[in-house]
Amino acid sequence: MLGDTALKLVHDSRRTAALDLLPAYQEELVRGVCREIRQLDASINKTQDEPGYDPQDRVAHCNLLVQHLAMRRDKRCLLAYQFTRARRMNEAAWKQTEEPNLNGNEQEYMKAYEDLIVDIKGPYTDIDLTGSLEPPNDVFIDVRVLQSVGEVQTEYGVFNLEKDSQFFVRRSDVQTLLLQGYLKEI
């Protein structure tokens, strides 16, 4: 039935929103949707090129309208799937996290986007453009160490960050470690 493959892509996009990691690219589904779009386009062109085609014929007009709307719906579903993946890759690039399930084209896109971020951040070395846009609620926070880091020198002294230990520290002192996943805010 028309649109079933595209609907699977939409379901995959919704499922992706709830996952921590981006799932593998659904290449077969994408190819299926593209194939369906080409078939619908060919069918529309064939109908319009027939010698007995009458644009005033309501049945033919309705048939063309349904095929055209199905083609547009497939395109929207495909674009929504691609946009969801691109948005997640952009977020990963800004957060400097790794996405392991990217295909070749997505890896190229991610690399180019990361290079663009480096170019943007280049002249502003004193400003952390990857930081959150929302101001912190508290200057000091409780953190739990997820991975042993060792000794960390801060403005207020030295912390020995061993796994499963907890500290009450300034957010600015441990922000990088939070982003890297060594610490978790409690």
Swiss-Prot record:
Keywords in alphabetical order: DNA replication, Nucleus
Localization per Swiss-Prot or TrEMBL: Nucleus
Listed GO CC annotations: GINS complex
GO biological process: one example: DNA strand elongation involved in mitotic DNA replication
Assembly behavior: Component of the GINS complex which is a heterotetramer of SLD5, PSF1, PSF2 and PSF3.
PANTHER family: DNA REPLICATION COMPLEX GINS PROTEIN PSF1, PARTNER OF SLD5
Role description: The GINS complex plays an essential role in the initiation of DNA replication.
Protein family: Belongs to the GINS1/PSF1 family.
Protein name: DNA replication complex GINS protein PSF1
Organism taxonomic ancestry: Eukaryota, Fungi, Dikarya, Ascomycota, Saccharomycotina
